[in-house]
């Protein structure tokens, strides 16, 4: 079995693959202050609840956009699993040709998503990841990573609104009954959701203008389904795209792989 760990700024998603299939998955809050023992105890609890044992894990791969957490995670892997984890970064074989001014600037999450999307859906592609930041990645018909856009995520945009406006409350991110809000909460929900849908449609449309062939649009991340339900510009929602990319990259880098 393969343990895959995707560390985001807000959430960490953990999965277990068996024979190329995602068998188990969990989402936890990202904590920059957990020790290797706290991570180990947390994983032991998740494993025991699912009837898994640490001894069943034969490999581990991690992608992270939060560098401070990596020391504890790597120590946890060696202490509790007795495995040196693969870590997505420079020097790994991803099979991705990155046409960025400085390829090292491309986040691990964006690389992993692109690798999975190309293998699953072909190219050209636009991959939209609704995370703490919303990222847009364009892959051309030659499977080259050409670049993209980074925007504030819907959650931090919402937090900025109520934290900077004294009379506006903290609200749930949800679809209002009507775009024309009849109270403060529904008006905020309307502005946030439909404003964000407009952002997605606008950026995707402009990327398509520059594409030489019509790209397929793949969405992932916690709020992908909410946005996709309000827009016809998203072709496919794949909630486990990042985990699949980690599994693919692990296979490309494991000892003995040709």
Swiss-Prot record:
A molecular function (GO) term: metal ion binding
Cellular location(s): Cytoplasm
Chain positions recorded as K(+) binding sites: 129
Record key words, sorted: ATP-binding, Coenzyme A biosynthesis, Cytoplasm, Kinase, Metal-binding, Nucleotide-binding, Potassium, Transferase
Origin superkingdom: Bacteria
Cofactor(s) this protein requires: NH4(+); K(+)
Pathway: Cofactor biosynthesis; coenzyme A biosynthesis; CoA from (R)-pantothenate: step 1/5
Binding site for substrate: 100, 107-110, 184
Function field: Catalyzes the phosphorylation of pantothenate (Pan), the first step in CoA biosynthesis.
NCBIfam families listed in its UniProt record: baf, PRK13318.1-1, PRK13318.1-5, PRK13318.1-6, PRK13321.1
Name used for this protein in its record: Type III pantothenate kinase
Organism: Bacillus velezensis (strain DSM 23117 / BGSC 10A6 / LMG 26770 / FZB42) (Bacillus amyloliquefaciens subsp. plantarum)
């Amino acid at each position: 079995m393969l343990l895959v760990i995707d560390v985001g700024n807000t959430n960490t998603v953990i999965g277990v693959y068996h024979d190329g299939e995602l068998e188990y998955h969990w989402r936890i809050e990202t904590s920059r202050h957990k020790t290797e023992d706290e991570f180990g105890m947390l994983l032991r609890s998740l494993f025991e609840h699912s009837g898994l044992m640490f001894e069943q894990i034969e490999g581990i791969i991690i992608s992270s956009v939060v560098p401070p957490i990596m020391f504890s995670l790597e120590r946890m892997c060696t202490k509790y699993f007795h495995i040196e984890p693969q870590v997505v970064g420079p020097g790994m074989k991803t099979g991705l040709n990155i046409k960025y001014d400085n390829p090292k600037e491309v986040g691990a999450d964006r690389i992993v998503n692109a690798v999975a999307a190309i293998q699953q859906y072909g190219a050209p592609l636009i991959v939209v990841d609704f995370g703490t930041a919303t990222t847009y990645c364009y892959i051309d018909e030659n499977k080259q990573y050409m670049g993209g856009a980074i925007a504030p995520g819907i959650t931090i945009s919402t937090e900025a609104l109520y934290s900077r406006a004294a009379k506006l409350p903290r609200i749930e991110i949800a679809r209002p009954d009507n775009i024309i809000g009849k109270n403060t909460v529904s008006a905020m929900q309307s502005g946030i959701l439909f404003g964000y849908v407009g952002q997605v449609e606008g950026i995707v449309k402009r990327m398509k203008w520059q594409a030489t062939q019509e790209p397929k649009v793949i969405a992932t991340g916690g709020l992908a389904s909410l946005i996709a339900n309000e827009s016809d510009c998203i072709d496919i929602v794949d909630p486990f795209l990042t985990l699949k990319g980690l599994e693919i990259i692990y296979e490309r880098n494991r000892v003995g792989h040709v």
